[in-house]
Regions:
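Beta-rich, blade/repeat-based domains predominating
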Residues: 46, 52-67, 95-114, 119, ...
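Short loop/turn segments that connect beta-strands within beta-propeller blades
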Residues: 83-87, 123-128, 210-214, 263-267, ...
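Beta-propeller domains
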Residues: 64-94
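A short loop-to-beta-strand structural motif that recurs across blades of beta-propeller domains
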Residues: 78-80, 119-121, 205-208, 258-260, ...
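Beta-propeller fold detector
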Residues: 48-51, 90-94, 130-134, 218-221, ...
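Short, solvent-exposed loop/turn segments at conserved positions within beta-propeller repeat blades
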Residues: 74-75, 115-116, 164-204, 249-257, ...
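Blade/loop signatures of beta-propeller domains
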Residues: 7-46, 362-364
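C-terminal closing repeat unit and adjoining cap/tail of repeat-based domains
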Residues: 304-364
Length: 364
Protein backbone atom coordinates (compact mmCIF):
# COMPACT_ATOMS: atom_id res chain seq x y z
CA UNK A 1 0.00 0.00 0.00
CA UNK A 2 1.25 3.47 -0.86
CA UNK A 3 2.09 5.71 2.13
CA UNK A 4 -0.59 8.30 2.74
CA UNK A 5 0.27 11.93 3.49
CA UNK A 6 -0.58 12.99 7.03
CA UNK A 7 -2.93 15.78 7.95
CA UNK A 8 -1.21 19.08 8.50
CA UNK A 9 -3.11 19.84 11.70
CA UNK A 10 -4.29 16.74 13.54
CA UNK A 11 -2.39 14.82 16.17
CA UNK A 12 -1.97 11.91 15.75
CA UNK A 13 -1.58 12.58 12.02
CA UNK A 14 -4.71 11.99 9.99
CA UNK A 15 -4.70 9.14 7.50
CA UNK A 16 -6.57 9.53 4.23
CA UNK A 17 -6.92 5.99 2.88
CA UNK A 18 -10.33 4.31 2.91
CA UNK A 19 -9.34 1.92 5.69
CA UNK A 20 -8.21 4.72 8.00
CA UNK A 21 -10.02 5.44 11.27
CA UNK A 22 -12.95 7.85 10.92
CA UNK A 23 -12.42 11.56 11.44
CA UNK A 24 -13.92 13.36 14.41
CA UNK A 25 -16.66 15.93 13.71
CA UNK A 26 -16.35 18.76 12.98
CA UNK A 27 -13.57 17.98 10.54
CA UNK A 28 -10.40 19.69 11.85
CA UNK A 29 -9.22 20.36 8.29
CA UNK A 30 -12.21 22.62 7.60
CA UNK A 31 -11.17 26.05 8.83
CA UNK A 32 -13.86 28.58 9.76
CA UNK A 33 -12.67 32.15 9.16
CA UNK A 34 -16.08 33.85 9.08
CA UNK A 35 -19.11 32.42 10.96
CA UNK A 36 -21.08 32.65 7.70
CA UNK A 37 -19.04 29.70 6.44
CA UNK A 38 -20.95 27.45 8.85
CA UNK A 39 -24.10 28.03 6.79
CA UNK A 40 -22.45 26.24 3.86
CA UNK A 41 -21.19 23.22 5.79
CA UNK A 42 -22.68 19.92 6.87
CA UNK A 43 -21.36 19.72 10.41
CA UNK A 44 -21.65 15.94 10.57
CA UNK A 45 -19.45 15.26 7.57
CA UNK A 46 -15.78 15.05 6.65
CA UNK A 47 -13.44 15.44 3.71
CA UNK A 48 -12.86 12.13 1.93
CA UNK A 49 -10.16 11.10 -0.48
CA UNK A 50 -11.99 8.88 -2.95
CA UNK A 51 -9.17 8.08 -5.38
CA UNK A 52 -5.45 8.51 -5.90
CA UNK A 53 -3.17 7.63 -8.79
CA UNK A 54 -2.73 10.69 -11.01
CA UNK A 55 0.33 12.84 -11.58
CA UNK A 56 -1.42 16.21 -11.83
CA UNK A 57 -5.20 16.05 -11.44
CA UNK A 58 -7.15 18.90 -13.03
CA UNK A 59 -10.39 19.95 -14.67
CA UNK A 60 -13.20 18.26 -12.69
CA UNK A 61 -16.62 18.64 -14.32
CA UNK A 62 -19.97 17.07 -13.49
CA UNK A 63 -22.27 15.45 -16.06
CA UNK A 64 -25.84 15.79 -14.87
CA UNK A 65 -27.00 13.52 -17.69
CA UNK A 66 -24.54 10.73 -16.99
CA UNK A 67 -24.26 11.19 -13.23
CA UNK A 68 -20.48 11.09 -13.33
CA UNK A 69 -17.51 13.35 -12.80
CA UNK A 70 -14.85 13.70 -15.45
CA UNK A 71 -11.38 14.96 -14.61
CA UNK A 72 -7.95 15.13 -16.22
CA UNK A 73 -4.53 13.83 -15.35
CA UNK A 74 -2.72 16.37 -17.49
CA UNK A 75 0.77 14.91 -17.28
CA UNK A 76 -0.57 11.36 -17.24
CA UNK A 77 -2.27 12.06 -20.59
CA UNK A 78 -5.49 10.46 -19.34
CA UNK A 79 -9.05 11.63 -18.77
CA UNK A 80 -10.87 9.81 -15.97
CA UNK A 81 -14.49 9.24 -15.03
CA UNK A 82 -15.81 8.88 -11.48
CA UNK A 83 -19.17 7.10 -11.40
CA UNK A 84 -21.47 8.42 -8.71
CA UNK A 85 -23.42 5.19 -8.26
CA UNK A 86 -20.42 2.97 -7.56
CA UNK A 87 -17.58 5.36 -6.73
CA UNK A 88 -15.49 3.61 -9.36
CA UNK A 89 -12.83 5.58 -11.24
CA UNK A 90 -11.79 4.40 -14.70
CA UNK A 91 -10.00 5.80 -17.73
CA UNK A 92 -12.40 7.57 -20.07
CA UNK A 93 -9.94 8.72 -22.73
CA UNK A 94 -6.32 7.62 -23.09
CA UNK A 95 -4.55 9.32 -24.63
CA UNK A 96 -6.47 12.45 -23.75
CA UNK A 97 -3.95 14.63 -25.58
CA UNK A 98 -3.15 16.16 -22.22
CA UNK A 99 -6.65 17.39 -21.56
CA UNK A 100 -6.73 20.05 -18.88
CA UNK A 101 -9.91 22.02 -18.21
CA UNK A 102 -13.34 20.42 -18.63
CA UNK A 103 -16.95 21.53 -18.42
CA UNK A 104 -20.39 20.57 -19.72
CA UNK A 105 -22.55 22.95 -21.73
CA UNK A 106 -26.29 23.51 -21.43
CA UNK A 107 -26.95 20.63 -23.84
CA UNK A 108 -24.92 18.21 -21.74
CA UNK A 109 -21.97 18.10 -24.14
CA UNK A 110 -18.49 17.84 -22.68
CA UNK A 111 -16.08 20.68 -23.36
CA UNK A 112 -12.33 20.12 -22.97
CA UNK A 113 -9.05 21.88 -23.53
CA UNK A 114 -6.18 19.82 -24.96
CA UNK A 115 -2.67 20.99 -24.15
CA UNK A 116 -1.13 18.67 -26.75
CA UNK A 117 -3.00 20.12 -29.73
CA UNK A 118 -3.39 23.52 -28.06
CA UNK A 119 -7.09 23.68 -28.72
CA UNK A 120 -10.64 23.59 -27.35
CA UNK A 121 -12.90 20.69 -28.32
CA UNK A 122 -16.49 19.61 -27.74
CA UNK A 123 -17.59 16.00 -27.39
CA UNK A 124 -20.99 15.66 -29.03
CA UNK A 125 -23.73 13.51 -27.56
CA UNK A 126 -23.23 10.98 -30.38
CA UNK A 127 -19.59 10.50 -29.36
CA UNK A 128 -18.02 12.53 -32.14
CA UNK A 129 -15.66 15.43 -31.49
CA UNK A 130 -15.82 19.01 -32.77
CA UNK A 131 -12.84 21.35 -32.71
CA UNK A 132 -14.10 24.64 -31.29
CA UNK A 133 -10.93 26.71 -31.55
CA UNK A 134 -7.26 26.10 -32.30
CA UNK A 135 -6.12 29.46 -33.67
CA UNK A 136 -6.76 33.19 -33.49
CA UNK A 137 -6.25 35.49 -36.45
CA UNK A 138 -4.27 32.79 -38.22
CA UNK A 139 -1.92 32.03 -35.34
CA UNK A 140 -2.03 28.87 -33.18
CA UNK A 141 -3.32 29.19 -29.65
CA UNK A 142 -0.81 28.79 -26.80
CA UNK A 143 -2.49 26.03 -24.74
CA UNK A 144 -6.10 26.72 -23.72
CA UNK A 145 -6.36 25.96 -20.03
CA UNK A 146 -9.85 26.39 -18.59
CA UNK A 147 -13.25 27.15 -20.04
CA UNK A 148 -16.81 27.99 -19.10
CA UNK A 149 -20.08 27.92 -21.11
CA UNK A 150 -22.58 30.78 -21.23
CA UNK A 151 -26.37 30.41 -21.67
CA UNK A 152 -26.13 32.25 -25.01
CA UNK A 153 -24.16 29.30 -26.40
CA UNK A 154 -20.77 30.96 -26.25
CA UNK A 155 -17.68 29.41 -24.66
CA UNK A 156 -15.19 31.56 -22.78
CA UNK A 157 -11.65 30.25 -22.25
CA UNK A 158 -8.18 31.25 -21.12
CA UNK A 159 -5.01 30.71 -23.14
CA UNK A 160 -1.83 30.72 -21.02
CA UNK A 161 1.39 28.91 -22.03
CA UNK A 162 1.47 26.16 -19.40
CA UNK A 163 0.93 23.27 -21.82
CA UNK A 164 3.88 24.22 -24.02
CA UNK A 165 6.35 21.86 -22.36
CA UNK A 166 7.35 18.21 -22.52
CA UNK A 167 5.41 17.16 -19.42
CA UNK A 168 2.04 18.57 -20.46
CA UNK A 169 1.98 18.18 -24.21
CA UNK A 170 4.95 19.18 -26.29
CA UNK A 171 7.34 22.11 -26.38
CA UNK A 172 7.44 24.65 -29.16
CA UNK A 173 9.21 23.68 -32.34
CA UNK A 174 12.74 25.04 -32.75
CA UNK A 175 12.95 28.77 -32.13
CA UNK A 176 9.77 29.04 -30.08
CA UNK A 177 9.75 30.63 -26.60
CA UNK A 178 9.88 27.24 -24.84
CA UNK A 179 12.51 25.81 -27.20
CA UNK A 180 14.64 28.77 -28.34
CA UNK A 181 17.78 26.77 -29.14
CA UNK A 182 15.88 23.88 -30.74
CA UNK A 183 17.48 21.19 -28.58
CA UNK A 184 14.12 19.68 -27.62
CA UNK A 185 12.49 17.46 -30.24
CA UNK A 186 8.69 17.71 -29.87
CA UNK A 187 8.20 14.69 -32.15
CA UNK A 188 10.07 12.14 -30.03
CA UNK A 189 7.58 9.58 -28.79
CA UNK A 190 4.63 11.63 -30.00
CA UNK A 191 4.49 11.81 -33.79
CA UNK A 192 1.02 13.39 -33.59
CA UNK A 193 2.82 16.62 -32.74
CA UNK A 194 3.54 16.85 -36.45
CA UNK A 195 -0.08 17.87 -36.89
CA UNK A 196 0.95 21.20 -35.38
CA UNK A 197 2.86 21.86 -38.58
CA UNK A 198 6.00 23.06 -36.87
CA UNK A 199 4.24 25.99 -35.24
CA UNK A 200 5.31 27.61 -32.01
CA UNK A 201 3.88 30.05 -29.53
CA UNK A 202 3.27 33.45 -31.07
CA UNK A 203 0.22 34.93 -29.35
CA UNK A 204 0.13 36.76 -26.02
CA UNK A 205 -1.69 35.07 -23.14
CA UNK A 206 -5.21 36.26 -23.89
CA UNK A 207 -8.73 35.29 -22.84
CA UNK A 208 -11.27 34.52 -25.57
CA UNK A 209 -14.97 34.16 -26.29
CA UNK A 210 -16.10 31.68 -28.92
CA UNK A 211 -19.46 32.53 -30.47
CA UNK A 212 -21.83 29.80 -31.76
CA UNK A 213 -21.44 31.37 -35.20
CA UNK A 214 -17.83 30.20 -35.11
CA UNK A 215 -16.30 33.62 -34.51
CA UNK A 216 -13.52 33.84 -31.93
CA UNK A 217 -12.91 37.17 -30.23
CA UNK A 218 -10.38 38.32 -27.70
CA UNK A 219 -12.16 39.60 -24.58
CA UNK A 220 -9.10 40.19 -22.38
CA UNK A 221 -5.53 41.01 -23.34
CA UNK A 222 -2.35 39.84 -21.69
CA UNK A 223 -1.90 43.36 -20.30
CA UNK A 224 -5.25 43.12 -18.51
CA UNK A 225 -4.82 39.59 -17.15
CA UNK A 226 -1.38 38.06 -17.73
CA UNK A 227 -1.27 34.27 -17.72
CA UNK A 228 -5.02 33.78 -17.28
CA UNK A 229 -6.03 30.45 -15.80
CA UNK A 230 -9.30 29.49 -14.09
CA UNK A 231 -12.50 31.41 -14.81
CA UNK A 232 -16.18 31.26 -13.95
CA UNK A 233 -19.36 33.33 -14.10
CA UNK A 234 -21.42 34.53 -11.18
CA UNK A 235 -24.82 32.79 -10.84
CA UNK A 236 -26.58 35.62 -12.74
CA UNK A 237 -23.85 35.75 -15.44
CA UNK A 238 -23.32 39.45 -14.79
CA UNK A 239 -19.77 38.96 -13.47
CA UNK A 240 -16.82 36.99 -14.80
CA UNK A 241 -14.00 35.99 -12.47
CA UNK A 242 -10.58 35.32 -14.02
CA UNK A 243 -7.43 34.06 -12.31
CA UNK A 244 -3.98 35.38 -13.16
CA UNK A 245 -1.37 32.77 -12.20
CA UNK A 246 2.42 32.70 -12.06
CA UNK A 247 5.03 32.79 -14.77
CA UNK A 248 4.65 30.07 -17.38
CA UNK A 249 7.15 28.48 -19.78
CA UNK A 250 8.56 31.01 -22.22
CA UNK A 251 7.12 33.96 -20.31
CA UNK A 252 9.12 37.13 -19.83
CA UNK A 253 6.98 38.43 -16.97
CA UNK A 254 4.06 36.20 -15.97
CA UNK A 255 0.95 36.65 -13.87
CA UNK A 256 0.50 37.68 -10.26
CA UNK A 257 -1.57 35.00 -8.46
CA UNK A 258 -4.73 37.04 -7.96
CA UNK A 259 -8.38 36.89 -8.99
CA UNK A 260 -9.95 39.68 -11.05
CA UNK A 261 -13.64 40.42 -11.53
CA UNK A 262 -15.30 41.98 -14.59
CA UNK A 263 -18.79 43.15 -15.46
CA UNK A 264 -20.24 41.19 -18.38
CA UNK A 265 -21.89 43.36 -21.03
CA UNK A 266 -22.98 40.99 -23.78
CA UNK A 267 -19.75 39.81 -25.36
CA UNK A 268 -17.66 42.51 -23.68
CA UNK A 269 -16.02 42.80 -20.29
CA UNK A 270 -15.82 46.09 -18.38
CA UNK A 271 -14.98 47.48 -14.95
CA UNK A 272 -11.91 45.37 -14.18
CA UNK A 273 -11.25 45.17 -10.45
CA UNK A 274 -9.23 43.10 -8.03
CA UNK A 275 -11.47 40.52 -6.37
CA UNK A 276 -8.81 39.03 -4.09
CA UNK A 277 -5.04 39.14 -3.72
CA UNK A 278 -5.26 35.58 -2.34
CA UNK A 279 -3.09 36.39 0.68
CA UNK A 280 -4.17 34.45 3.78
CA UNK A 281 -2.24 34.94 7.02
CA UNK A 282 0.60 36.35 4.94
CA UNK A 283 0.67 33.24 2.73
CA UNK A 284 -0.05 33.37 -1.01
CA UNK A 285 -2.78 30.81 -1.70
CA UNK A 286 -2.14 30.70 -5.42
CA UNK A 287 -5.50 30.38 -7.22
CA UNK A 288 -6.11 28.02 -10.12
CA UNK A 289 -9.55 26.61 -10.99
CA UNK A 290 -12.76 28.28 -9.80
CA UNK A 291 -16.45 27.52 -9.26
CA UNK A 292 -19.31 29.52 -7.74
CA UNK A 293 -22.23 28.24 -5.71
CA UNK A 294 -25.85 29.40 -5.94
CA UNK A 295 -25.20 32.09 -3.32
CA UNK A 296 -22.39 33.57 -5.39
CA UNK A 297 -19.57 32.33 -3.16
CA UNK A 298 -16.32 31.63 -4.98
CA UNK A 299 -14.50 28.33 -4.35
CA UNK A 300 -10.88 28.35 -5.52
CA UNK A 301 -8.14 25.75 -5.62
CA UNK A 302 -5.13 26.79 -3.54
CA UNK A 303 -1.54 26.17 -4.61
CA UNK A 304 0.24 26.83 -1.33
CA UNK A 305 2.44 25.16 1.30
CA UNK A 306 1.00 22.47 3.56
CA UNK A 307 -1.44 24.07 5.93
CA UNK A 308 -2.74 26.37 3.20
CA UNK A 309 -2.94 23.95 0.27
CA UNK A 310 -6.51 22.99 -0.57
CA UNK A 311 -9.46 25.30 -1.22
CA UNK A 312 -10.23 28.88 -0.24
CA UNK A 313 -13.84 30.12 -0.11
CA UNK A 314 -14.83 33.77 -0.65
CA UNK A 315 -18.16 35.56 -0.50
CA UNK A 316 -19.28 37.73 -3.46
CA UNK A 317 -17.68 40.79 -1.85
CA UNK A 318 -14.27 39.11 -1.77
CA UNK A 319 -14.24 38.32 1.96
CA UNK A 320 -12.61 35.07 3.01
CA UNK A 321 -15.17 32.73 4.60
CA UNK A 322 -13.04 29.69 5.22
CA UNK A 323 -10.63 27.10 3.93
CA UNK A 324 -10.50 23.39 3.24
CA UNK A 325 -7.07 22.04 4.08
CA UNK A 326 -5.78 19.16 1.99
CA UNK A 327 -2.51 17.23 2.21
CA UNK A 328 -1.89 18.04 -1.46
CA UNK A 329 -1.95 21.14 -3.65
CA UNK A 330 -5.42 21.57 -5.15
CA UNK A 331 -5.66 22.68 -8.78
CA UNK A 332 -9.39 22.78 -9.39
CA UNK A 333 -12.87 22.14 -8.01
CA UNK A 334 -16.37 21.30 -9.25
CA UNK A 335 -19.80 20.76 -7.73
CA UNK A 336 -21.43 17.41 -8.43
CA UNK A 337 -23.62 14.62 -7.18
CA UNK A 338 -27.36 14.24 -7.93
CA UNK A 339 -28.10 17.33 -5.82
CA UNK A 340 -24.95 19.18 -6.97
CA UNK A 341 -24.11 19.55 -3.28
CA UNK A 342 -20.75 17.77 -3.23
CA UNK A 343 -17.51 19.64 -3.83
CA UNK A 344 -15.02 17.57 -5.82
CA UNK A 345 -11.39 18.67 -5.52
CA UNK A 346 -8.64 17.58 -7.90
CA UNK A 347 -5.49 17.82 -5.81
CA UNK A 348 -2.20 16.76 -7.38
CA UNK A 349 -2.33 12.95 -7.22
CA UNK A 350 -5.81 12.52 -5.77
CA UNK A 351 -9.52 13.27 -5.90
CA UNK A 352 -11.27 14.52 -2.75
CA UNK A 353 -14.93 15.22 -2.00
CA UNK A 354 -16.92 17.07 0.66
CA UNK A 355 -20.70 17.31 1.02
CA UNK A 356 -22.04 20.84 1.54
CA UNK A 357 -25.20 22.81 2.31
CA UNK A 358 -24.98 24.70 -0.96
CA UNK A 359 -25.13 23.77 -4.65
CA UNK A 360 -23.12 24.53 -7.73
CA UNK A 361 -24.53 27.41 -9.74
CA UNK A 362 -23.92 26.27 -13.29
CA UNK A 363 -23.64 23.15 -15.44
CA UNK A 364 -20.28 21.43 -15.44
Amino acid sequence: MMPVPPSVVTNPPRQWDRCAPPTIYPDPDIVIVDPAFNDLLVGLNAIHRVWTGSIWAEGPAWSGQGQYLVFSDVQGNTQYRYLWETGEVSALRKPSYNSNGNSFDFQGRQLSTQDFFRRVVRWENDGSMTVIADSFEGQPLNSPNDLVPHPDGSIWFTDPPYGARLSEGHPDFAGGPTNPDGRLNPLVGQPDAGAMGGKSRVLPTNTYRWDPSGRLERVLTEEQVPDPNGLCFSPDYKTLYVVSTGKGPGDKVGGNNVIYAFDVQGSKLTNQRLFSDMIVDGVTCGPDGLRVDVYGNLWSGSNAPLGYAGVTVWNPQGKLLGRIRLPEVCANVAFGGPKRDHLFMTASQSLYVLQLLTQGAAPG
